[in-house]
């Protein structure tokens, strides 16, 4: 397969936030203990007019701004999410139409818990690398839900990022050196049809689920590339909370300097399918030519996708062509628990 890489990327976040103290206060919990345990201080809250489709459209348009290509040249659009607005009606079609891609393209909505976005990137790599098309777009986005009073309510957040994959060397802002996946049947987190909120295995979501897959996915990628943590300038992992992310990074030998730009959960919460794509977007916003990035996603059920990426000198030309992830994080408005319940549709009669 020929060399492929990222030619454009973009991110989007709702402006609304809720602090852990407001959620904990509503349930009589110790906010400081929760913040220490999860390493999460606040999370994003989608407004009443925001969903996975609107977030994906904004992220995709910003990716197009950075890529500087004709959207009609994109041959595939994939949107990975746990929270597609419709059970039957593709989000990918909405995104493509809003971005001027349609009608000569293929599209699909993807699901694999929190790694559907990175699965889409792998699909785009294959389609572009095999010369089936010139460009392909993958989006990872979610407006995640947690049941009132559940531990997930402190982290389940909203946001997403889009990536346009191409192969023209002069257009690449980052190239893929390799990818690796590790997948099993592990029932750590699930939601059946017609259920409003997901269920999870509590502590079972840790060692036998998240850590097993992230660490094995990472080790498999390093073995394939014959590398160690010292060979990379940055890293990003799936982040259901800050504690898991930091633990995984340290177990693999990464330092805070390497993992800090990818870690957004303390200020954003867990954006599910958007978590790793958003973390990677923040790294790209800060990266320079020849920086090497190590990426590992995780999706419950369960699996991990890993990537080895090298940034090119074109990165400096495109960063300022769209709003950065850091600027989106800084643009925020806090809401209280009552407004949060209203915006998330949690008040049910």
Swiss-Prot record:
Class of enzymatic activity (EC top level): transferase
SUPFAM superfamilies per the UniProt record, alphabetical: Thiolase-like
Binding sites annotated in the UniProt record for (3S)-3-hydroxy-3-methylglutaryl-CoA: 30-31, 114, 155, 205, 238, 270, 300
Record field: catalytic activity: acetoacetyl-CoA + acetyl-CoA + H2O = (3S)-3-hydroxy-3-methylglutaryl-CoA + CoA + H(+)
Assembly and interaction partners: Interacts with acetoacetyl-CoA thiolase that catalyzes the precedent step in the pathway and with a DUF35 protein. The acetoacetyl-CoA thiolase/HMG-CoA synthase complex channels the intermediate via a fused CoA-binding site, which allows for efficient coupling of the endergonic thiolase reaction with the exergonic HMGCS reaction.
Annotated positions binding CoA: 203, 243
NCBIfam families documented for this protein: HMG_CoA_syn_Arc (TIGR00748), PRK04262.1 (NF003274)
PANTHER family per record: 3-HYDROXY-3-METHYLGLUTARYL COENZYME A SYNTHASE (PTHR43323), HYDROXYMETHYLGLUTARYL-COA SYNTHASE (PTHR43323:SF2)
Active site feature: 82 (proton donor/acceptor), 114 (acyl-thioester intermediate), 238 (proton donor/acceptor)
Entry similarity comment: Belongs to the thiolase-like superfamily. Archaeal HMG-CoA synthase family.
BP terms from Gene Ontology: farnesyl diphosphate biosynthetic process, mevalonate pathway; isopentenyl diphosphate biosynthetic process, mevalonate pathway
Keyword annotations: Acyltransferase, Isoprene biosynthesis, Transferase
Pathway the protein contributes to: Metabolic intermediate biosynthesis; (R)-mevalonate biosynthesis; (R)-mevalonate from acetyl-CoA: step 2/3
EC numbers: 2.3.3.10
Function comment: Catalyzes the condensation of acetyl-CoA with acetoacetyl-CoA to form 3-hydroxy-3-methylglutaryl-CoA (HMG-CoA). Functions in the mevalonate (MVA) pathway leading to isopentenyl diphosphate (IPP), a key precursor for the biosynthesis of isoprenoid compounds that are building blocks of archaeal membrane lipids.
Keyword Transferase appears in the UniProt entry: yes
GO function term, MF aspect, one: hydroxymethylglutaryl-CoA synthase activity
Annotated protein name in UniProt: Hydroxymethylglutaryl-CoA synthase
Native species: Methanococcus maripaludis (strain C7 / ATCC BAA-1331)
UniProt keyword annotation of Amino-acid biosynthesis present: no
